[in-house]
Amino acid sequence: MNLQEKNIYCGFRLDKISHISEISSNAYEFYHEKSGAKLLFIENNDDNKVFSITFRTTPTDDTGVAHIVEHSTLCGSRKFPTKEPFVELVKGSLNTFLNAMTFPDKTMYPIASRNEKDFRNLMDVYLDAVFYPNMRTTPEILMQEGWHYEIDNVDAPLAYSGVVYNEMKGALSSPDGLLERKILNNLYPDTTYQYESGGDPVAIPDLTQEMFIDFHSRYYHPANSYIYLYGDMDMMSTLSFLDEEYLSNFNKIEIDSHIDVQKPFTARKLIKDIYPIAPGEAKENKTFLSMNYSIATSLEKEKMLAFTVLEHALLKSEAAPLRNALIKAGLGSDVISSFDNGILQPMFSIIVNGSEANKVDEFTKVVTDTLNDIVKNGIDDELLQASINSMEFKLREADFGQYPKGLIYNINLMNSWLYDGDATVYLHYEEALKTVKQWAKEGKFEALIQEYLLDNTHSHILILEPDENVITKQEKDLADKLAQKKASMSKEDIEKIIADTQKLKERQRSVDKPEDLEKIPLLKIEDITKQCDKLIIAEDEIADTKVLRHDIDTNGICYLRMLFDISNIAYEDINYLFLLEEFIGRTATKNYTYEALANAVNLHTGGMRFAVATYDKEGDVDSYMPKFVFKAKVLVDKMPELIKLLQEIIFNSSFTSKERIKDLAMQCRSDFEMSILRSGHQLVLDELMAYFTPKERYDNFGDLKFYAFIKNFLNDFDNEFNKMQTAFAKILPMIFNKANLLTSITVSKNDYKKVISAIKPLLEVLPNETYPKQEIPFAVEKKNEGFITSSQVQYVAKGANFIRLGYKYTGAMKVLETIMRYEYLWTNIRVLGGAYGAFVKFRRDGNMYFGSYRDPNLVETLNVYDKTAEFLRNFNVSDREMTKYIIGTISNIDMPLTPALKGELASSAYIAEMTDEMRQQQRDEILATTQEDIRALADLVDACMKENAICVLGGSNKVNEAKDVFKTVTIIL
């Protein structure tokens, strides 16, 4: 299309056209003259289309109003007056992404879809939601999504509840999440960044309906919006839709959403704060020490790229000198770093975990001395080049897993566009990359360290210490505050709250009118592709080993996976497999120090790692096939270097350095402890699944069992180190053996021969010894564990294995997941219960579970699970609703996959003996699912719930109150 700059198209003035060679796209920058909206269209042939509308939202308090408005806009609007159009879209659209996100200074509403009609429908619902939300006239929406007083009768105590209120109680229970917020708030104390945009639970109840509406009125106007379009679409039709349906209804106004720049500090500050741990939890060596710096502005792209490189070189690489200096000084168990350039004034953080407050002076000295030494003597050239290569590989690969590329580009480009900079500058990286490479030659990196780290007074040291009294004090303060509030109320006031609570619950339980539901656009079953995508796979035999070939265009990159059979490893050595996973490739070898090895890996590859993975055979609940997996990604031309490095690691790794092994073990323990509160739901699900099948029991050696193992390993280090030497000497030759080796290669067809010629020498020198398979008697055991942490919310899981109960897997169970997650569990656990989320899974191996996330309840949630069968027996919806559930289910299984994920899916299916015919059968069953099929699953769910297998992680009060449902209760940290 031949468009001209300065011309008007559908009410939009075209200000600039540019080509972005890095992502093979054309960029069109528009301005809507009547409303003042800014629009950027990134045109290319990607069928995974993305739309978003972003508002610059700058909070002025800690009430979380930006976050609560983000939730609430999607709770009904002018054209779509159902209670939750968002949920209806998730149930029944072919979206590849659908969400909304609150950042410290912006709120983003992105959607993505490969279906053109679906894409337009999603845009329509989202635009109506942000500009005409029912939250402005329906106070129950703030009550549900934000907060409300809750009381059932006059004599009951007053309480707070609300989705965001409980979400943030969970978010701020995690020490790393709390640390991140404290760093930001204290580095920019005179700007909008001093406030918690997500909301502080202490302040959330200060938010009134008037403040809520005022925030929306102030910021949710086209003149304060940034509209983004990406992919293969009809530009004129889309612009016309935006103009006629929405933007032309608004007149341009002046909106003050500017972000003040923090005046630099005249001297570095020292800040002390505390975070909660569970009563009775050990607090020794659990302090965080951090040095935090303000770095330029995000508009200075070259500096932003340079600090991405510096973070890797100084703190992330195994060869990072600052990281290693801090570890060797014995200042803590792990070093963490962060460079956040998603705000106007980016921040760079150096963090030691597992420390003590009295080590802060030594911490400061080690950081300063090490950085001075680096400036004086220069950054090691190989380390710097390796770090630049690591960043460049990621930029060129642009593999964002299951997230649409267009979405990640959108988030990245806001780092300039939101602050009135060039809208596309973060998509053009070639020139900046050249500049950064030149800086490496000129000593500019050392100058950046001097200017922004050593001489920078706009910085602070933040000490975050554990305190077991925090939760008790917070709970007492809250109880006292609510008791005083209730005491100050008249009987009429209390009765009004009871009535308001009842009115809210009635609204939450009410069913949307059929005519309102029908206003939300819905595709037809005919719009869905009937055939599932075929697995891309072919078998070869190379050097007496099986090779799986996945011919996929990878743009010159090879994704390599080598799966070594470890079914020969004895039960008593399984812990050492997971220990080896943590250590191998991170220690010295015969020809490399561990630092030199890290540099070589980063210089020649896009990354490599080892991991234990367990597979099962389709339809066999007692099968388990453990593998020790090597994964790497590399430019095809660099394959020989990758294979040389892999050979060095396999045959010449040394595990004899006590210092290095202890450092790695401490990092491993620290990582696990951080993940417990960050991903509590994953921990309870992993533990629960281990009750049911041998495969999950095997995997559990890498979960909580491994945490216990690594703690003991460190507590009795000298003795355990010697045991490790013996175990590694035994298992290494048994692992790296080509008997039953399976290699998976994902690469373009034309590059396959190059890859094989590079890998063949390794396959030829691998030993070919046959070891007997170990038959390990994994007993099925329901442990029913309760785990206590400092969390103020719970993660509640319950499940069973339905195949063991005599049932079979069917595709209808995938539809049941959609119904449960976005109907029954959504209503009862999120909407009525106040939890942030709930989820459900029915797996082909027979394992099923229900789970809740950041949940204020425990026993009540288990009761909801137990009543599922009753809900299913009475399940009765319209044909239109049933179609919606089927479409939403297909959307979930048809997510676009990157080349790496396509190869991984095909090789995993091969191992499990899952055929295209089986996958097609599942799709056929999904498309044919009826209400009768759903009702027929009630007995299966009932039988699973009667197994009464549960696992919960949560706060001490809730877990102890429910102790009768557990066999064991443990303080986990």
Question: Model-found features: residue ranges?
Answer:
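His/Glu-based metal-binding/catalytic segments typifying zinc-dependent metallopeptidases
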Residues: 43-45, 52-54, 165, 169-173, ...
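Generic recognition of flexible, low-complexity loop/linker segments
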Residues: 97, 213-217, 276-279, 322, ...
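Non-catalytic terminal extensions that flank enzyme cores
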Residues: 1-50, 266
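Non-catalytic, conformational "gating/processing" segments within enzyme and secreted inhibitor domains
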Residues: 161, 213-245, 703, 724-759, ...
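M16 family metallopeptidases and their MPP-like homologs
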Residues: 48-58, 84-132, 139-150, 177-202, ...
